[in-house]
Amino acid sequence: MSKQKELFANEEIAQAEKTKLQPPPMYKVVLNNDDYTPMEFVVEVLQKFFGMDLDKATQVMLSVHYSGKGVCGTFTAEIAETKVVQVNTYSRNNEHPLLCTMEKA
């Protein structure tokens, strides 16, 4: 191999070593309290869309009820956006004002 090609190859390797992949930004999916959505419906949403068991869903629901909001999980932006749309659509289809939002983690 010529010295020029060897030098170029070594520079590419050095550059590749400097470039490190960063983890994607993460977002919290949050349920916000309201005075109208039944607690049972909130638990149902947490089980249906976030795969929580009854105990965990009840804990998060109580956090929503007493603290004003509760974190459902932390996800990449695309997954968080999808979950927010799914929960808000499901809530409206069931005539509940439950609001799901996302926040930078």
Curated annotation (Swiss-Prot):
HAMAP family: ClpS. Belongs to the ClpS family. The gene is clpS. Involved in the modulation of the specificity of the ClpAP-mediated ATP-dependent protein degradation. The lineage of its organism: Bacteria, Pseudomonadati, Pseudomonadota, Gammaproteobacteria, Aeromonadales. This is ATP-dependent Clp protease adapter protein ClpS. GO terms for biological process: protein catabolic process; proteolysis. Pfam families: ClpS. Disulfide bonds: none annotated. Binds to the N-terminal domain of the chaperone ClpA.
